[in-house]
A protein has these predicted regions:
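Anion-binding and metal-coordination hotspots
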Residues: 1-336
Length: 336
């Protein structure tokens, strides 16, 4: 009636709520490989890219482990007798559906991740509840499926969501992702990846020493590998700033969906996008702050994901109703 909710600009972020679980009561469980939401699409694009470069398609991996999430396994799957070479995760015996979350530099707790979406006016649109050990970029698809038909034009997220898969997902659906700047994770004293220029015509990278890094292969993670000539690099004056490899070969990777990331960078540099991203602190961050300060959202007294979902739904519904009541009071409307 009053068109209070504007679904064209959606802000997405996640916060963590401490679970009702003792940090000392845990067991190790063998980590199981969880299928990514874009795995099949990526595999097809990888094989198509390899065939375009004259290479054979990759064979499927033999995986005996069934995909598993943060805490849906039975207690029979937990054991203290884990082989040393197996990758394990810590699982609470009190609340198995929670996840082991790194809260600070030296602090870990069992927690739940609450991924939330709101509009530019601070109205909470939807949410999902996940184990605290799952990364935001992996859980995004579950929330996005709930937001698919609301008329979203811009999706404003933080650096944790800045991945080629999410960029492709949004752009293919006609939604503009608004990502922040993410600094390069390069060692001090070494050239950044941006200093290696991609030559699209020759499908090669050009290093600061003005030499080519030619295509080598496309790996299972979806990255094309471009390698330099070790004999040329051995005599290069920039070798100490380029690579520490014993054979003096520099490897630069480029994702098969890197074009989507470049489109997102163009969007980031568009006029008005920086101001739009700055509204996160007034919208989604404000919601989390209010929930933690006024509604006991720092921790939960309930066990299990289902009860946690109930708590979050009730809290967010109350926050929306309180916001609506204040709006009506300001407008002088009767509460009917």
């Amino acid at each position: 009636r009053f068109k209070l909710v504007d679904s064209t600009e959606i802000f997405v972020d996640a916060t963590h709520v401490k679970a009702r679980a003792n940090n000392r009561k845990m067991q190790k469980r063998i980590a199981k490989q969880e299928a990514l939401f874009y795995a099949d699409m990526l595999r097809q694009d990888i094989n198509a890219d390899r065939e375009a470069h004259g290479k054979k398609p990759l064979k499927d991996k033999e995986d005996n482990n069934k995909p598993g999430s943060g805490g849906n396994d039975k207690f029979e799957d937990y054991t203290d007798d884990v082989p040393a070479d197996e990758k394990t995760i810590k699982c609470s015996t009190t609340d198995p559906e929670s996840g082991w979350f790194r809260k600070g530099e030296h602090k870990h707790v069992f927690a739940y991740g609450i991924e939330t979406a709101c509009d530019k006016n601070g109205w909470i649109i939807d949410f999902t509840v996940n184990p605290g050990n799952e990364h935001d970029s992996r859980t995004f698809k579950g929330l996005y499926d709930k937001l698919a038909d609301i008329g979203m034009k811009y999706c404003i997220v933080d650096a944790g969501y800045k991945t080629p898969a999410i960029a492709k997902l949004l752009l293919d659906d006609g939604i503009k992702p608004v990502f922040p700047y993410k600094r390069p994770m390069t060692k001090d004293g070494f050239f950044r990846k941006s200093e290696y220029v991609y030559d699209e015509y020759n499908d090669a990278y050009i290093c600061p020493g003005n030499h080519f890094l030619h295509y080598s292969t496309t790996n299972r993670d979806g990255y094309r590998e471009y390698k330099s000539c070790g004999q040329i690099c051995e005599k290069c004056e920039y070798l100490s700033q380029c690579t520490e490899s014993k054979n003096h070969v520099k490897v630069v990777t480029r994702h098969v969906w890197e074009d989507y990331m470049e489109t997102c960078e163009d969007i980031r540099h568009t006029e008005g996008m920086k101001e739009l991203y700055s509204h996160r602190k007034e919208t989604i961050e404000r919601i989390f702050g209010t929930a933690k300060e006024n509604h006991g959202f720092r921790y939960t007294q309930l066990y299990g994901k289902a009860r946690m979902t109930m708590k979050v739904a009730l809290t967010f519904a109350c926050m929306n109703l309180k916001k609506l009541a204040k709006c009506k009071q300001e407008w002088g409307l009767r509460m009917t």
